[in-house]
A protein has these predicted regions:
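C-terminal structural segments of small proteins and small subunits
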Residues: 49-79
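Two-component histidine kinase catalytic core, primarily the HATPase_c
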Residues: 36
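An amphipathic alpha-helix signature
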Residues: 2-6, 10, 41, 63-67, ...
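Thiotemplate assembly-line natural product biosynthesis machinery
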Residues: 1-17, 76-79
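Phosphate-binding glycine-rich loops and adjacent basic patches that engage nucleotide phosphates
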Residues: 1-7, 26-33
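Phosphopantetheine carrier-protein modules
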Residues: 12-31, 48-59
Length: 79
C-alpha cells in the first residue's frame, strides 16, 4: 500500500519517490495544498475502489496515517 500511495503522491506534487517517508506530512513536508489532497483522495477512491470519508480524511496528516486508513478500508471491502 505504501508503494502504491507514493506513486500517486508523485503525480500531485513535485518530489522524488525516495523522499516520501511514512512520517512525511502531506501539507508541511510534501507541499500539498488542500485542493491537491482532496484531488488525490478522489484518485485513490477510483484506483482502489474504496469510499473515503471526508471527515476522517481531514484527520490524516502523514503518509503512514493514510496507509493505515486505506488498509482499514481495504479490509472492510473484503468482508
Amino acid at each position: 500500500m505504501f508503494d502504491q500511495l507514493t506513486e500517486i503522491i508523485c503525480e500531485y506534487v513535485e518530489t522524488e519517490r525516495e523522499k516520501i517517508l511514512p512520517e512525511s506530512r502531506f501539507m508541511e513536508d510534501l507541499g500539498f495544498t488542500s485542493f491537491d489532497f482532496m484531488s488525490m483522495l478522489g484518485e485513490i477512491e477510483d484506483q482502489l475502489d474504496v469510499e473515503i470519508d471526508e471527515a476522517e480524511a481531514a484527520n490524516i496528516r502523514t503518509v503512514q496515517e493514510a496507509v493505515e486508513y486505506l488498509e482499514k478500508l481495504e479490509g472492510e471491502k473484503e468482508e
